[in-house]
């Protein structure tokens, strides 16, 4: 049996925070605001995985009202989500992600992101696709106010 999940997330830029996307720290003058480390891509992937098994979203499992998750490493959160998915009897078919940002340029970091995500999801890098686009200076991402991301995951029963 196959299950498909979709995820979407956005985070606003702020001074004085590191920019972490896909488990990789990216040099930039601003980072993203969030209760955790605000890794917009890993949050999106977690939501897609949880959605595929009809288990809610990242906020249900790691609420921003819980101080235990303040400044949490999103890689650890995704590992916990993936462990839960595997306990339900699923493995990854493939994952396709899009980062939506005017700046910084993501291309130099995409292979590192793919590698890190493949490690977190215990799969071959060949099952992970990450791409990036801009909104041609339209909307909040185009005005460089934040970053958005989307992901689609295909899970299959073990």
Swiss-Prot record:
Cofactor or coenzyme needed: a divalent metal cation
Pathway given in the UniProt record: Isoprenoid biosynthesis; isopentenyl diphosphate biosynthesis via DXP pathway; isopentenyl diphosphate from 1-deoxy-D-xylulose 5-phosphate: step 4/6
Residues the entry annotates as binding 4-CDP-2-C-methyl-D-erythritol 2-phosphate: 9-11, 35-36, 57-59, 62-66, 101-107, 133-136, 140, 143
Residues where a divalent metal cation binds: 9, 11, 43
Complex formation: Homotrimer.
Any one Gene Ontology molecular-function term assigned to this protein's record: 2-C-methyl-D-erythritol 2,4-cyclodiphosphate synthase activity
Name listed for the protein in its UniProt record: 2-C-methyl-D-erythritol 2,4-cyclodiphosphate synthase
Alphabetical keyword list: Isoprene biosynthesis, Lyase, Metal-binding
InterPro entries linked to this entry: MECDP_synthase, MECDP_synthase_CS, MECDP_synthase_sf
Enzyme class: lyase
One of the GO biological process terms: terpenoid biosynthetic process
Signal peptide: none
Gene designation: ispF
Swiss-Prot/TrEMBL catalytic activity: 4-CDP-2-C-methyl-D-erythritol 2-phosphate = 2-C-methyl-D-erythritol 2,4-cyclic diphosphate + CMP
EC annotation from Swiss-Prot or TrEMBL: 4.6.1.12
Site label Transition state stabilizer, positions: 35, 134
Protein task: Involved in the biosynthesis of isopentenyl diphosphate (IPP) and dimethylallyl diphosphate (DMAPP), two major building blocks of isoprenoid compounds. Catalyzes the conversion of 4-diphosphocytidyl-2-C-methyl-D-erythritol 2-phosphate (CDP-ME2P) to 2-C-methyl-D-erythritol 2,4-cyclodiphosphate (ME-CPP) with a corresponding release of cytidine 5-monophosphate (CMP).
Family of this protein: Belongs to the IspF family.
A Pfam family reported for this protein in Swiss-Prot or TrEMBL: YgbB
PANTHER family registered for this protein in UniProt: 2-C-METHYL-D-ERYTHRITOL 2,4-CYCLODIPHOSPHATE SYNTHASE, CHLOROPLASTIC
Xref: SUPFAM superfamilies: IpsF-like
Note on how the cofactor is bound: Binds 1 divalent metal cation per subunit.
């Amino acid at each position: 049996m196959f299950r498909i999940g979709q995820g979407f997330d956005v985070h606003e830029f702020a001074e004085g925070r590191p920019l972490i996307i896909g488990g990789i720290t990216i040099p930039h003058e601003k980072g993203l605001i969030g209760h955790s480390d605000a890794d917009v891509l890993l949050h999106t992937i977690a939501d897609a995985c949880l959605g595929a098994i009809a288990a809610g979203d990242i906020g249900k499992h790691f609420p921003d009202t819980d101080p235990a998750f303040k400044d949490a490493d999103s890689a650890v959160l995704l590992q916990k989500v993936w462990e839960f998915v595997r306990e339900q009897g699923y493995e990854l078919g493939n994952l396709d992600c899009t980062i939506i940002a005017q700046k910084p340029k993501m291309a130099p970091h995409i292979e590192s992101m793919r590698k890190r995500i493949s490690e977190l999801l215990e799969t071959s890098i060949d099952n992970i696709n990450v791409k990036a686009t801009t909104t041609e200076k339209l909307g909040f991402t185009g005005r460089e106010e934040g970053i958005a991301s989307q992901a689609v995951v295909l899970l299959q029963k073990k």
